[in-house]
Amino acid sequence: MAINSESKANGALMRITPLAVASAYYSHEESIALAYKDAELTHPNITCQQANACYVLAIRHLIMQPGDSTGAIHAAQRYLEPFQSEVGAWLNDALNGNIPDATRMIGFVRHGFTRAFHHLATGSELRDALFHTLQAGGDTDTNACIVGGLLGAYWGIDEIASKSSSAPMLDRVINCDTSLGQTRPARYHAKKMIDHVSAFTVYR
């Protein structure tokens, strides 16, 4: 398979949430290395690797320190400190509300990354964050996936389930009938993920 090392597309960041959740079992350094390795599979550009690492470290922090959005952002900032990186500029943009037009350069990893950290910094409700991401246009499903992963880690499943604004969305995902439409193996059902996450009770 040919890999474009110049690509800064969003595919690696879109799929990194499960690894970010699992990183609660790994050290800080191991989590960064895994984030890099996963990006290298399809998106080896250093920008994609660094975006992955920021996102993984933020979710890792939120799992270990639930609700601490400030600490999650600081984890990403501390990781970026040694680098003169465009990802660092994106993170600053996110914190300052400078959100790029998602309909330009559709598929650019910057869009999902910036929106995810912006909504984390502002404490957006999950439903509102997803609504505004979808409303912005562009690569809507992928950007919403990226935003949803980080905001989901921030709010947590119990809080999401208790809110009238987000509970119906969660119910549709958890109780979806996978026998309808284009079927998927039962082992990939969302309920399986909940079982795995529930097992994360001890961290290094």
Q: Where do the PLM segments sit?
A:
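Amphipathic alpha-helical interface segments
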Residues: 1-123, 129-136, 150, 154
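Short phosphate-coordinating micro-motif centered on Lys-Gly-acidic
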Residues: 146
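Conserved glycine-rich phosphate/nucleotide-binding loop
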Residues: 157-204
